[in-house]
From Swiss-Prot:
Organism: Myxococcus xanthus
Pfam family, one: SCPU
InterPro entries to which the protein is assigned, alphabetical: Spore_coat_component (IPR053167), Spore_coat_U/FanG (IPR007893)
Name used for this protein in its record: Protein U
Origin: domain of life: Bacteria
């Protein structure tokens, strides 16, 4: 008796599968629209090994005297923007700008940590130090995003002939990226 019930159940199950097979089922289709918006974004920071421009030692008596040479230095920032996004990187005037300093033509100075003496310096976009780096869209560095962090070089010069006392001179310049 159990064998008959099992056989009937098996036949019923098989018949139900045949009755609802995909060959006999109706279908309907619709499109699913899928979208995403990728916004332009940028970040700027000191990055690995960046964020500092150290000029080293300034020698106002011999090497960097009025008859000597300027002191050069190089630093870097880490910049990342969305692929193919355009941006402009600007550098502020620093904490101790000289009289007459403007956003377009910054007259930057480092201050002696132990006094109120200043050591003037300039920042440039190019290794030849011909294009001054300012804090306006016209004096900033154009940048095209690659989607990856990119080191951006900052070139500096401390002009020769500055008669200053010994000590450690510092300044902080705000780097801004506008995108």
């Amino acid at each position: 008796m159990n064998a008959i019930k099992t056989a009937v159940a098996a036949v019923t199950a098989a018949a139900s599968l045949v009755a609802f097979s995909p060959a006999e089922a109706a279908t309907a289709t619709a499109n699913l629209n899928v979208t995403a918006n990728v916004g332009g974004a940028c970040s700027i920071g000191s990055g690995a090994g960046g964020g500092t421009l150290n000029f080293g030692t300034y020698d106002p008596v011999v090497v960097n005297s009025a008859l000597g040479v300027d002191l050069f230095g190089t630093g870097s920032l880490s910049v990342q923007c969305t692929l193919l996004s355009t941006a402009v990187i600007t550098l502020g005037q620093g904490l101790y700008p000289a009289a007459g300093s403007t956003a377009a033509v910054p007259l930057r100075r480092m201050r002696n940590a132990a006094s109120t003496d200043y050591l003037s310096y300039f920042l440039y976009m190019d290794v030849t130090r011909l294009i001054a780096w300012g804090n306006t869209s016209g004096t900033g560095l154009p940048f095209l995003g690659l989607g990856l962090p990119v080191p951006v070089q900052v070139y500096g010069t401390v002009p020769r002939g500055q008669n200053v006392p010994s000590g450690t001179y510092n300044d902080t310049v705000v780097a801004t990226i506008t995108f």
